[in-house]
Amino acid sequence: MARITPIERYRNIGISAHIDAGKTTTSERILFYTGVSHKIGEVHDGAATMDWMEQEQERGITITSAATTAFWSGMSQQFQQHRINVIDTPGHVDFTIEVERSMRVLDGAVMVYCAVGGVQPQSETVWRQANKYQVPRIAFVNKMDRTGANFLRVVEQLKTRLGANAVPLQLPVGAEDNFKGVVDLIKMKAINWNEEDQGMTFTYDDIPADMLEACEEWRNNLVEAAAESSEELMEKYLGGEELTEEEIKGALRARVLANEIILVTCGSAFKNKGVQAMLDAVVEYLPSPVDIPAIKGINEDETEGERHASDDEPFAALAFKIATDPFVGNLTFFRVYSGVVNSGDTVVNSVRQKRERFGRIVQMHANKREEIKEVRAGDIAAAIGLKDVTTGDTLCDPNAPIILERMEFPDPVISVAVEPKTKADQEKMGLALGRLAQEDPSFRVHTDEESGETIISGMGELHLDIIVDRMKREFKVEANIGKPQVSYRETIRTRVNDVEGKHAKQSGGRGQYGHVVIDLYPLDPEGPGYEFVNEIKGGVIPGEYIPAVDKGIQEQLKSGPLAGYPVVDIGVRLHFGSYHDVDSSELAFKLAASIAFKAAFNKANPVLLEPIMKVEVETPPEYVGDVIGDLSRRRAMVNGQEANDFVVKINAEVPLSEMFGYATDLRSQTQGRASYSMEPLKYAEAPTSVAAAVIEARKK
C-alpha cells in the first residue's frame, strides 16, 4: 500500500501547557476544525473527546497523553492535505513524567498560555523539558475573551520568565468581552471568524484604524526577525526592499526549526476564534519528521547507528506509552522513526531480545480507534496485544536491530505499605497494582515476607500519591497508606578472619551437625555486591554441602543483623570446617553458615547506608538564599549553581530521608515558582545519630 500523505506533510506535535490554560479545549477545537469530531466536546460538560479516562472527565484535567490523528488543509484550503498527529500532554505538575515521555516522540509543540494567568510555574517546567529535547515550538495565547486578558503582557512574560525570543505573528482585535478576532501581521489583514458556523468560515477585513500604528510596529518587528535568518535577506531588508510573503514565511520557519524564535498566536478556543489560524501556523512553521535530525541509536555490535525518517530504511520505532484499555487490554503507543510495518509482521524488541508479532494496529482518535493495516516512518499509532514491551523499548526489523535512546529506570527509593479497606478491595487491589506497574516501569510492588503487607515502591512521594489516586479512581480500590519508608542498606567497613559457626544437635536419634569457618570482607560499591569464595582443602567439608553454605549466607543478606535491611558489598571466604558422616545435612550447614555470618558481620564494623538523591532545583534568583538555607538544614551537600537571567539552577546531594514534604516546602518558599527534580544517585554511610535512630525505630 502506497503512502497516503508524503512525510513532508506530517506534523507530530504536542499541545502543552499549564493546568487550566485551556489546553484540552484547544485540542478539541483542533479535532473539530480538522473534521474529526462533529460535535464539539466541552470540558465544562465533561464531554471532551481527548480526555478519555473517566476521572479526567470528572475533574476536567488531562492525565494520560492521548494521541490523535487529524488532517488539515488550511483555513482557506490553501495547503495540500497535512496529517497532524496531536499528543495531548498533561499540564499538572504531578504528571511530568508523562510530559517528558511525549516530548521524546514529538517533532514540534504548541505551548498554550492563558491570556490572564500568563506564564505560570508549570509552564516553566514544561518549557525546560522542551528545551532538553530541543523541540521547536510556537505559542498560542488562549482565553483572550476572559476578563483581564492581556496578549502583550504574556508575550513579555515569555521573554522575561522563559528567556524565549517571542515574536508575535498576530495581534488581537479587542479583548475580554470585545474580543473579535486577530490581525495577521504578515498579510496585514484582520481575520474575523463567523460565529454562526462555530468559526468554520471567516473573512479578511481591513485593520481597525485605531490599531494600524501598533500593527505597523509589530509587523516591522516580525519582518526583522525573518530578515535575521540569512545575510541575503538582511541586505535586502536593510536596503529598503520589501520582503515577499513567501520569503518572510520561509525565513521564520527556518528560525523556528533552529529554536531561535517562538512565534506567538492568540485566540479563544472556547469562542471558536484563533485555533484555525494556529493550525495554519503548525503547518507553516513546525517541523515535519524530515526536518529534524536522524534519531541516534546503538547497533548490535555496540557501534552508534542512526535512522532517518524514510520508508526505505529498516523499520525502527520507540514504544513511549503503555495504556490499559477496558475493551482490548494493553495498548502500546509507538512512534515510527523509519521503515514500514504491517499488521501480522514480526519485529524484535531489541532491548529485551524478544520477538513480537504486530497483531492489530490502531490509529487513535482520542478514545475512538480505527484499525489500520500498516504504519510508516513518521506515524504515531498503537499496537494491541504486544506481550512483553515496556516504555522506552525499541521495536525494529529483526534483520537490522538497533536500540534507540534507551530509557534507564532506576530502582525505587521510597516505599509505603498499602492495605485495602475492605475484603472486596483486596482482590481488586492486586489486579490494579499489577496493571499500574506494567504501565509505569519506575513503580514496583512486592509483599513483605514478615508482615505480609503489600509494599509499593517508587521514585518519590508524589509518584506514589498518584498511583494510590489512580487505584481509587480507575480501579475503584480504596486503600489505607502507611508512612513512607526509606530503603536503607547495611554493609561492613573492616575485614574479619576465622569466624566460626557451628550448628550441632546430637542428643539421641539422628542429629544435626554443620561447622564452618569464614572470613568476611568489604567489597567495592561499584562491584558485584556479593561474592562467595570456596577454599576448602582436603575435603574437611564435602563438596555437596558447599552450595548450602553459600545459600545460608545469601538468605541472611536479605535482612541484615543491624536493622533488617538488605546487606550489600560483602565477600565471604569459606576456608575450614568439619562434618559428621551421619548427622551432617544441607540444612545443618545452611544454619551453621548463617550463625557464622551474623557473628562475623557484627565484628566487622557494620554500618547503615542511606540513599542519597541528586537534587536539582530551578528557582528565580530572588529565592536562592532561602532555597540553599533550606537544603543545608536537610543535610545537603550543595555542589554548585548555574545562573542565567531568569533562573538559577542549584545542584545538590541530599539524603532521601530529608526530602519528605520537600515539594510543599519549596512551593511555599518560592510562591510556587521553583521546580525541582530528584533522582537516586548512590548509597552513602549514614551519620551515627541517624543510623542509631533508624535502628532504634526498627526494634519497636
From Swiss-Prot:
Chain positions recorded as GTP binding sites: 17-24, 88-92, 142-145
Domain tr-type G: 8-290
Key words of the record: Cytoplasm, Elongation factor, GTP-binding, Nucleotide-binding, Protein biosynthesis
Record's subcellular location: Cytoplasm
InterPro entries per record: EFG_II (IPR041095), EFG_III (IPR009022), EFG_III/V (IPR035647), EFG_IV (IPR047872), EFG_V (IPR035649), EFG_V-like (IPR000640), EFTu-like_2 (IPR004161), G_TR_CS (IPR031157)
PROSITE patterns for the chain: G_TR_1, G_TR_2
Gene Ontology cellular component terms for the protein in this record: cytoplasm
Biological process, per Gene Ontology: ribosome disassembly
HAMAP family: EF_G_EF_2_B (MF_00054_B)
General function of this protein: Catalyzes the GTP-dependent ribosomal translocation step during translation elongation. During this step, the ribosome changes from the pre-translocational (PRE) to the post-translocational (POST) state as the newly formed A-site-bound peptidyl-tRNA and P-site-bound deacylated tRNA move to the P and E sites, respectively. Catalyzes the coordinated movement of the two tRNA molecules, the mRNA and conformational changes in the ribosome.
This protein's name: Elongation factor G
Gene name as annotated: fusA
